[in-house]
A protein has these predicted regions:
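Glycine-rich phosphate-binding/hydrolytic loop that grips phosphoryl groups
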Residues: 1-9, 13, 18, 121-141
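Conserved ATP-utilizing enzyme core subdomain
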Residues: 15-60
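Short low-complexity, flexible loop/linker segments enriched in glycine and/or proline
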Residues: 28-29, 111, 136-139
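Adenine-nucleotide phosphate-binding core of ATP-dependent small-molecule kinases
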Residues: 43-93, 124, 128
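Gly/Ser/Thr-rich loops at beta-strand to alpha-helix junctions
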Residues: 99-104, 128-129
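Short acidic, glycine/proline-enriched helix-loop-strand junctions
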Residues: 103-122
Length: 141
């Protein structure tokens, strides 16, 4: 997230990315199912699901829209990778940890994708410290 944001927008902190994507609009960036199905040809499908990240990047897209597009793309990549890994092992519950889990837009992506793919994303309290706790406990194995 930081690398893409720094390269594309010159923004290099999660806090600034969070702030700038608050007023972003994915309609100016991502091609979604609703753009492909004007007549609602896919009943029961979430029409806000992304068909192509940055597939509808508009010349009117603002820095805010692009920041939200980056957050959305990174979140969807994490979510779909986790979903495929869970399915490979017959699991439906996916526990998420790390700093990104504290971002409201990241959480919103997981919330939106969970019912579509019939999984449960679990974000525990203090999830941002999960990777550090794992590293600290590793020597005790």
């Amino acid at each position: 997230l930081i690398g893409l944001s720094k390269k594309m927008l010159g923004i290099d902190t999660v806090e600034h990315i969070e702030q700038i994507c608050e007023s972003g609009n994915l309609d100016n960036v991502d091609l979604r199912v609703k753009d492909l199905s004007k007549n609602h040809k896919y009943p029961g499908m979430n029409e806000d699901i992304t068909a192509s990240n940055f597939g509808k990047l508009s010349d009117i897209a603002t820095k805010h829209d692009i920041a939200l597009g980056i957050v959305n793309m990174v979140s969807e990549t994490i979510a779909t990778t986790a979903i495929f890994a869970a399915r490979a092992h017959g699991l439906k519950n996916i526990v998420l940890t790390g700093n990104l889990t504290t971002m409201p837009h990241v959480r919103a992506v997981f919330t939106a994708l969970a019912p579509t793919f019939d999984v449960n994303f679990i974000i525990p309290a203090n999830s941002q410290f999960g990777t550090v706790i794992g590293a600290a406990l590793h020597p005790f194995k």
